[in-house]
């Protein structure tokens, strides 16, 4: 491949759904359409348009997000590969980004499964998605679609919609689905994690209650849905219940616990660590921990598992929730680049970027309290052990 050749912009199974390298990170605004409380359906159905296999953890496949995936997404220019020879050897920044994606894949690929189902439906791809197997090119395409949630354009769009009310989100979904194209993935969040699903229809059991029908990769071919009460501005969703109408552990939330992400932001997404400026324009951290005793101090303020917003910086569970009780939760911290301090009191794995620093580390023990200080103008980290208690 020519080192200056940009990947083709197609939304398909093998070809990536991204454009080539260039910096990004401007804020995003949204336009909320009027709410039309009439039933609407896009024509997509979990079978045959969803995958027949369930959402899977990274350990379920021997495949990994690799240099070929990075080249498919961003091309093989100097910011991705160390030379023009094949195979590509990733630059330090590209390798760090790939490691972050692989860490994020630990709990599941629901984001990638939802995005690939939507894109294949829009492109009328064959064979039917339900007939595909979780191997080879299919698995790597799902990984690349999963990785789009870490692009600046995608994250900015998601943050903008997270500020809207649940009824605004229903209005946007209804307007989109009328076109016959499922343009949005849907994210729902609780303290136990986040999950990505694909809306394909909106029904109205009553005047003030919307039922958003979704393809849920945890339940292939299943009849799953998110219920939104327009009066209380609350939503409910059965994450783990076999019968979603009678789930004792149903997820509940309101404004800020539900968002949508347009497919267009993924198609126009750009390489987050490429461009004329050295380093990324935003801080992006992936924090994995079974405990909530961590915090991140940024120029905007401090965010944590229990305080998910400070200025332009947010901390939100990653949309890859595990069905295993007590499993570690992944959080995505995204915001203003500047001096960043990550403090944890127990085992925590962190991967990400801030300024020129791309890094990955794991603390050594649950009774060790540590702080990592990242300066965007430097390529080194300052590590402090705040205390250490023998077990």
Where are these regions (language model features)?
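Extracellular glycoprotein-like low-complexity segments
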Residues: 265-391
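Bacterial N-terminal signal peptides that target proteins for export
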Residues: 1-10
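Active-site signature of cysteine proteases
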Residues: 190-261
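C-terminal motif of bacterial Sec signal peptides marking the signal peptidase cleavage site
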Residues: 18-20
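Bacterial signal peptide processing site
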Residues: 22-25
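Conserved active-site-adjacent core of cysteine acyl-enzyme catalytic domains
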Residues: 116, 120-194, 204-207, 217
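Active-site-adjacent structural segments surrounding the nucleophilic cysteine of cysteine proteases
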Residues: 30-136
